[in-house]
């Protein structure tokens, strides 16, 4: 499918379903380093803010998940249990539980308050690389190096469906805001949209050439999909039309599956880590780089945006091992 930016992309893209569009939009963000979180002993793999805004969870190659205070970066607790490195962690909608994906071929469901592992989800035949809850948080989705996507029931820990999704490792999986659709990305160069109830593939987004898809995510309102590919490119798709609306470049991403994000608490930005040790922030509309955050000493593998405040968390690989919290006053 052609990925030339369609003419109607000049129309403003409303990302969030809330009615806060009338806010004064700042010219540029002005994120500055607030604090550095030290605790992991190997590469950090993922950072995620809890939906209630209170906590930050980080996962690492050290097999641990650490919970931190979202605003002050204060160490809260460590979750132990995986046998091999963890690639991803995700929160339930009520911020009470976490799911983690590990090279030990399992996912674990955690009770955050007690720090206990509630269930271990077994069924993948290779590394589990990515995971997410659906909005009601009764289902978990996972993607693996076994090239499948699995849908799990939280209550029982049973696998409900296995989607023979891709012909290479699955790099990312995400539910839309209603929980009716799933998006998956893979090293096979494809981004696929699935019906969550039936497990049917509804659409495949195909790029001009087929660079590996390293990350995918629905926009907050579910109308768009953000994809990252290992040719130093992020793209915003109107997936119902199969059209690429925006392309974001300037960062470095050819090797790692780096998390990207929509920032909607101030202006409308796209935020991503990069292999040149920086966090990049683009204006969603104009595609201009509006800020680069400097401070990490290795690849920034993950960047997360706080649900209500102008806060970004970033995490870096093994020459750094830290998480940084960045704050903007507008």
Swiss-Prot record:
<feature type="repeat" description="WD 5">
    <location>
        <begin position="208"/>
        <end position="249"/>
    </location>
</feature>
<dbReference type="InterPro" id="IPR036322">
    <property type="entry name" value="WD40_repeat_dom_sf"/>
</dbReference>
<feature type="repeat" description="WD 4">
    <location>
        <begin position="165"/>
        <end position="204"/>
    </location>
</feature>
<feature type="repeat" description="WD 2">
    <location>
        <begin position="81"/>
        <end position="122"/>
    </location>
</feature>
<feature type="region of interest" description="Disordered">
    <location>
        <begin position="1"/>
        <end position="26"/>
    </location>
</feature>
<keyword id="KW-0853">WD repeat</keyword>
<feature type="repeat" description="WD 6">
    <location>
        <begin position="252"/>
        <end position="292"/>
    </location>
</feature>
<protein>
    <recommendedName>
        <fullName>WD repeat-containing protein 5B</fullName>
    </recommendedName>
</protein>
<keyword id="KW-0833">Ubl conjugation pathway</keyword>
<dbReference type="GO" id="GO:0048188">
    <property type="term" value="C:Set1C/COMPASS complex"/>
</dbReference>
<dbReference type="InterPro" id="IPR020472">
    <property type="entry name" value="G-protein_beta_WD-40_rep"/>
</dbReference>
<feature type="short sequence motif" description="DDB1-binding motif">
    <location>
        <begin position="188"/>
        <end position="192"/>
    </location>
</feature>
<comment type="similarity">
    <text>Belongs to the WD repeat WDR5/wds family.</text>
</comment>
<feature type="repeat" description="WD 7">
    <location>
        <begin position="295"/>
        <end position="330"/>
    </location>
</feature>
<dbReference type="GO" id="GO:0042393">
    <property type="term" value="F:histone binding"/>
</dbReference>
<dbReference type="Pfam" id="PF25175">
    <property type="entry name" value="Beta-prop_WDR5"/>
</dbReference>
<feature type="compositionally biased region" description="Basic and acidic residues">
    <location>
        <begin position="1"/>
        <end position="10"/>
    </location>
</feature>
<feature type="compositionally biased region" description="Low complexity">
    <location>
        <begin position="11"/>
        <end position="23"/>
    </location>
</feature>
<feature type="repeat" description="WD 1">
    <location>
        <begin position="39"/>
        <end position="78"/>
    </location>
</feature>
<dbReference type="InterPro" id="IPR019775">
    <property type="entry name" value="WD40_repeat_CS"/>
</dbReference>
<feature type="repeat" description="WD 3">
    <location>
        <begin position="124"/>
        <end position="164"/>
    </location>
</feature>
<comment type="function">
    <text>May function as a substrate receptor for CUL4-DDB1 ubiquitin E3 ligase complex.</text>
</comment>
<keyword id="KW-0677">Repeat</keyword>
<dbReference type="InterPro" id="IPR001680">
    <property type="entry name" value="WD40_rpt"/>
</dbReference>
<comment type="subunit">
    <text>Probable part of a cullin-RING E3 protein ligase complex containing CUL4B-DDB1 and a substrate-recruiting component (DCAF). Interacts with CUL4B and DDB1.</text>
</comment>
<dbReference type="InterPro" id="IPR015943">
    <property type="entry name" value="WD40/YVTN_repeat-like_dom_sf"/>
</dbReference>
């Amino acid at each position: 499918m052609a990925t030339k930016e369609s003419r109607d992309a000049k129309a403003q893209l409303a990302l969030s379903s809330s009615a806060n569009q009338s806010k004064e939009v700042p010219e540029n963000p002005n994120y500055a380093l607030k604090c550095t979180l030290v605790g992991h002993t190997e590469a950090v793999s993922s950072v995620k803010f809890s939906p209630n805004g209170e906590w930050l969870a980080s996962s690492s190659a050290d097999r641990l998940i650490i919970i931190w205070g979202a605003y002050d970066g204060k160490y809260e607790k460590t979750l132990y249990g995986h046998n091999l490195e963890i690639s991803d962690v995700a929160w339930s909608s009520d911020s009470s539980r976490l799911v983690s994906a590990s090279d030990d071929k399992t996912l674990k469901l955690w009770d955050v308050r007690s720090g206990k592992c509630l269930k271990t989800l077994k069924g993948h035949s290779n590394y589990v690389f990515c995971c997410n809850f659906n909005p009601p948080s009764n289902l978990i989705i996972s993607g693996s190096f076994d090239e499948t996507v699995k849908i799990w029931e939280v209550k029982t820990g049973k696998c409900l469906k296995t989607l023979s999704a891709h012909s290479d490792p699955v790099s990312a999986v995400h539910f839309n805001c209603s929980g009716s659709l799933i998006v998956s990305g893979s090293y096979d160069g494809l981004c696929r949209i699935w019906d969550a109830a039936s497990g049917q593939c509804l659409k495949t987004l195909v790029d001009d050439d087929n660079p590996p898809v390293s990350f995918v995510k629905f926009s907050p309102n579910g109308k768009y999909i953000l994809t990252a590919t290992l040719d130093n490119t992020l793209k915003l798709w109107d997936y119902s039309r199969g059209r690429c609306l925006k392309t974001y470049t300037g960062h470095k991403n050819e090797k790692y599956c780096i998390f990207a994000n929509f920032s909607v608490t101030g202006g409308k930005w796209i935020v991503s880590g990069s292999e040149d040790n920086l966090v990049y922030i683009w204006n969603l509309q104009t595609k201009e780089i509006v800020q680069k955050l400097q401070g990490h000493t290795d690849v920034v593998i993950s960047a997360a945006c706080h649900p209500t405040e102008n806060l970004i968390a970033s995490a870096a690989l093994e020459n750094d091992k830290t998480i940084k919290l960045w704050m903007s006053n507008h």
